[in-house]
Amino acid sequence: MLLIFEYLVMTASTRWFPAQPYTVSLVPLLFTVVLVRWGVWAALPGLLGGLWFCYLSGAEPSRYAVFCIGNLLPLLLIPFLASWRKEKGSFSGSLPAVGLGVAVLLLMQGGRALVSLLFGADPALLPGFFTTEVVTDLFTLVVLWILRRLDGMLEDQRHYLQRLREEEARS
């Protein structure tokens, strides 16, 4: 799903809107959902999304590092998620779901900016990592806001299955 969507978006944006710097991506959304449900496995959509984006855009090797390594910075949220799980269990509220989305987006884009700096990018170009992702940011936050209402979507998978088992035992 990720690879097909990214391919369609890249094809459409380069053909129909070649002068526009904006794009939309599923990577932050999938990363966030997988991060909540399965933890470190969120690295897979982060890496695959970065590799695929770079491949489709004909990027040079340093850009592969920027996107693949930069996309992984939100993994730093794993200790926070562990403590949140113990206290709350899920991200079913509006503020927690959107707040987590904002944190993932900022860390992902900040990670790309940081890796770019390490490769010698001009610091004046760094705001572009945040501004070109505006459509992706809005898309991610709106979908997370919707997903929070679906039972178990923004909940640790083990916690969700245990909760279901307990609910079935009570009924």
Label every PLM stretch briefly:
Residues M1-E6, W38, L100-Q109:
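Alpha-helical transmembrane segments of multi-pass integral membrane proteins
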Residues M1-R37:
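Hydrophobic transmembrane alpha-helices
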Residues L3, Y7, G50-L51, N71:
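Residue-level recognition of pore/gate-forming positions within transmembrane alpha-helices
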Residues L8-V9, V33-V34, F53-L56, L77, ...:
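Residue-level signal for alpha-helical transmembrane segments in multi-pass membrane proteins
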Residues T11-P21, E60-G70, F80-S171:
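Membrane-embedded alpha-helical hairpins and interfacial helices in multi-pass inner-membrane proteins
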Residues F31, N71-F80:
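Alpha-helical transmembrane segments and their membrane-interface exit regions
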Residues V33-L47, R85-G89:
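Membrane-helix interface "capping/anchor" motifs
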Residues P45-F67:
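Membrane-helix boundary elements
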